[in-house]
Amino acid sequence: MASFGTALTIRHLEGDGMAQAATPVAEAAVGASGTDAQVVKGADGHYWAEANIDGKAVRVLVDTGASVVALTRADALRLGVEPEPEAFTGKVQTASGVVRAAPVQLKTISVAGARVDRVEALVVEQGLEYSLLGMSYLGRLSAFSATPAGLTLRP
């Protein structure tokens, strides 16, 4: 699977080893609705999208190497998602090293019309430059594909 993002991929860590995150792909893309969405490739070669997360706009990097949607602490606060300090029980590997994260569930994420409800996500405590649109969203779509010009998301 190609990664559309940078080396800032999020992977769950268990014990001393890295666990492969299993992303459930529903038979009929359960929870996905709407219309096909187009994401234009940025001048930097990455796929940046304006996501509507729980009713608010958040700029995200599309990253198939991220097992889940990952929110920066600042984006989470703007969305009204404020995990308690003791909720940061997870550990994730980023390009910056191992950091703590808090699991959350987002009501809805929509990118240019491709909507997914009840999306699992992580709020990364620190060290994440920008929020990532990972496989907990992408894996619930019926399909997504990349071309040199852009990315198509199909609910």
Residue ranges and their predicted role:
Residues M1-R59, T64-P155:
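Pepsin/retropepsin-fold aspartyl endopeptidases
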